[in-house]
Regions:
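Flavin (FAD/FMN)-binding glycine-rich loop and adjacent Rossmann-like elements that form
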Residues: 151-162, 166-530
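N-terminal Rossmann-fold NAD(P) dinucleotide-binding loop
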Residues: 41
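Conserved beta-strand-loop-beta-strand element in the redox core of flavoprotein oxidoreductases
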Residues: 136-157
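Conserved N-terminal/central alpha/beta ligand/cofactor-binding core
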Residues: 53-54, 59-141, 181, 189-191
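Beta1/beta-strand and adjacent pyrophosphate-binding region of the FAD-binding site
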Residues: 27-38
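Bacterial Sec-dependent signal peptides at the C-terminal "C-region" and cleavage site
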Residues: 4-27
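Extracytoplasmic
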Residues: 531-676
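Aromatic pocket-lining residues of Rossmann-like dinucleotide-binding sites
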Residues: 48
Length: 676
């Protein structure tokens, strides 16, 4: 009977719906072992399988998709055109779920469902609840890894030809003996300006917030969350880590809402700084003051940090990257309790302004999310942990276009972004006050290529390991790269590269990168289908315009900019499909809002007074078709212009004309999507 109970206690439910024994005998040698079931890990596994390799996917937890399925539903990406391949397909499938061509905001359970679907379609069973115990190497090659259950029992050996580390922590990379960095480099190390210590003004306390338990009395001690460390000069390197938090999915729908209850160990003194912050200036509402709300479908949220004291637990994660599993579990639990207490404090502490308490009490945990983790996210936002120091280190110069690479295998498109790393006492005009340090938000540059060499270690260290998440980058460059869509792109790259290394019988550092680039470009879904053609208004080779057009770089544009005409004079823009392959295509035109907006379909901003009648001419190389669209509808969405057959050697195009409308007309991007 004891043997039977022991057996049953170690069964877990695999994503395909089959029961899978966690302590099964060692698996046969597989081609590719992916460690980490993050969004990158799923795409890496699927990519390797689609190009013909046997794959095993190992995930330390019990959920798939990482942060994409853990609450980050407001996709962080500066330029949607940078998202390619399986990553773009993911957001297309999200769109299909919600009745659009593609969508960049979604509910957590929908994301996890889609990741499971990808694995099911590929015939991959993820092995969950299996964390890394050790790595076996022969020379510069990993020969096997040993994983164990979360309680440290039932070790299992897994052998593979190639390994991919898709964990947020870089555990496989570290155990394989690969050089890595933790913390922030000094600016001098890579000739950067935004690395190291940065005392700036974003997510900052107002002047004069007293740091002591008893105001003006240092002997009373510091308030909770303030470190005793001294502020170093700007640009100084250190071992601090940008803050982690939970991206919170809440709902205001009473039928689907569970109240935010007082958490275990609740201590209101942990939020005393919030009261002192509010005493300096009482906010009118929660969003953009105490937190940042972004609405998801079905009355749900993705809530992020915003302000001096918010959901970021600054300073509580500095030992996380190299910590033991037990210590990491403590850190994760501390973040969970802090977050629950933060929301409870706002809604229930009588010292909080009543209008903020009332607003907070509108929100609660959704009944239909995270049903096996008490309706609270299963994934802490590990913004940064270890970073590999590989064959090539991405730096600020890459972000700004001052250094370029020829082996690019994916694009990054976000600002150089770091959340705060420390909360300290500083003096200003002789007065001690609390300050957050480390937040950087520097943009103004376009998409830039990520070097393949940043995904592989130095040759002497390991020749069969690819690291697409904890890749080789400085702290500030990593802050631009570290977005979930980019991780998916790099995961796909890693899967294809691992397969190619097997086929070429080479170290991952020595594969034909040109061949890898061609595969990703010409077969982006890895299924042999024709690649789509996306023509953006900034494509000078394919786009011509007549009349007066203003190029705007703000708003909900699809790429870097959008064209706007509204002077009442005739004007037109032609999007030519030069180089398109023959076949049947469904053609779409993107319809952005002129200002603001987060790119959510149907979202309308204060300047949505666009033209109601815009003339469209579609020429597929043989048939010329005219139609009229209303740009006041389907905001931030793709407008379907119908199906068209493109013949070999023809030159199709889509032309948009203003017809002299005094209302603003926008011209952004045209998509030629193959019909399967």
């Amino acid at each position: 009977m004891k043997t039977l109970l022991f057996f049953l206690s170690f069964l877990f439910f695999a994503p395909t719906g089959r029961f899978f024994p966690a302590f099964s005998p060692p698996v046969p040698v597989v081609d590719v072992c992916v460690y980490g079931g993050t969004s990158a890990g799923v795409m890496a596994a699927v990519a390797a399988k689609r190009v013909g390799k046997s794959v095993i996917l190992i995930e330390p937890g019990k959920h798939l998709g990482g942060l994409t399925a853990g609450g980050l539903g407001a996709t962080d990406i500066g330029n949607k055109m940078a998202v390619t391949g399986l990553a773009r397909d993911f957001y297309r499938r999200i769109g299909t779920h919600y009745g659009h061509l593609e969508q960049w905001t979604f509910e957590p359970h929908v994301a996890e469902m889609l990741f499971k679907t990808y694995l099911r379609e590929a015939g991959i069973t993820a092995q969950l609840n299996s964390r890394l115990r050790s790595v076996q190497k022969r020379g510069s090659q990993i020969s096997a890894i040993v994983v164990e259950q979360a309680n440290g029992t039932t070790p299992q050996t897994i052998r593979a030809k190639q390994f991919i580390d898709c964990s947020y922590e870089g555990d496989l990379m570290a155990m394989a003996g690969v050089t890595f960095a933790v913390g922030r480099e000094a600016n001098s190390q890579y000739a950067e300006a935004w690395n190291g210590v940065q005392l700036l003004d974003k997510h900052q306390f107002p002047d004069g917030v007293d740091p002591y338990r008893i105001p003006s009395k240092p002997e009373s001690g510091l308030l909770y969350g303030i470190e005793k460390a001294k502020l170093n000069p700007n640009g100084t390197g250190d071992q601090t880590i940008q803050a982690y938090n939970y991206r919170m999915c809440l709902t205001d729908q009473p039928a689907n809402r569970l109240p935010i209850m007082r958490p275990d160990g609740y201590d209101s003194t942990k939020y005393e700084l919030l009261l002192r912050q509010i005493q300096k200036k009482v906010p009118n509402e929660l969003t953009w003051n105490l937190m940042h709300f972004v609405m998801m479908p079905n009355h749900k949220t993705d809530i992020n940090n915003c302000g001096g004291l918010s959901t970021d637990m600054i300073g509580a994660n500095h030992d996380y990257p190299n910590a033991s599993y037990a210590r990491r579990a403590e850190i994760i639990r501390d973040h969970e309790l802090y977050t629950k207490g933060f929301f409870y404090f706002i809604g229930h502490d009588p010292r909080m302004p009543k209008h903020l308490r009332d607003e907070m009490l509108r929100w609660g945990y959704p009944k239909d999310e995270y049903v096996d983790t008490d309706h609270f996210s299963h994934q802490l936002y590990i913004r940064e942990a270890r970073r590999m120091v590989g064959e090539y280190v991405m730096t600020q110069a890459n972000c700004e276009g001052k250094a370029t690479v020829t082996d690019g295998i994916g694009m990054a498109a976000y600002t150089m972004d770091s959340h705060n790393c420390q909360r300290l006492v500083v003096e200003k005009d002789g007065v001690a006050m609390v300050r957050n340090e480390g937040d950087v938000q520097v943009g103004g540059f376009g998409p830039y290529p990520i070097s393949y060499r940043a995904l592989v270690s130095k040759t002497a260290e390991c020749t069969n390991l690819i690291v697409p998440v904890c890749l080789s980058a400085s702290h500030i460059a990593y802050g631009s790269i570290r977005m979930e869509p980019v991780f998916m792109v790099l995961g796909q790259t890693a899967g294809v590269a691992a397969a190619q290394a097997i086929n070429e019988d080479k170290a991952v550092q020595g594969i034909d990168v040109g061949r890898l680039q061609r595969t990703l470009r010409e077969n982006p879904l890895l299924d042999g289908s024709h690649p789509e053609l996306l023509v953006d208004n900034d494509d000078s080779l394919r786009v011509t315009r007549q009349g007066n057009w203003q190029r705007l770089t703000k708003g909900s544009k699809y790429g870097t900019s959008v064209l706007v005409s509204g002077d009442g004079q005739p004007a037109s823009v032609r999007f030519a499909a030069a180089g398109i392959k023959p076949g049947r295509y469904r053609i779409y035109m993107y319809n952005p809002t002129r200002a603001g907006g987060g790119g959510n379909p149907d979202q309308v901003d204060l300047q949505s007074d666009k033209a109601e009648r815009v003339q469209i001419r579609v020429f597929d190389g043989k048939v010329d078709k005219s139609l009229t669209i209303n740009q006041q509808r389907q905001n931030n969405d793709w407008i379907n212009l119908g199906e068209h057959v493109v013949m070999a050697g023809k030159a199709p195009y889509v032309e948009l004309a203003t017809a002299g409308s005094p209302q603003p007309t926008v011209a952004d991007a045209v998509l030629f999507l193959p019909v399967k």
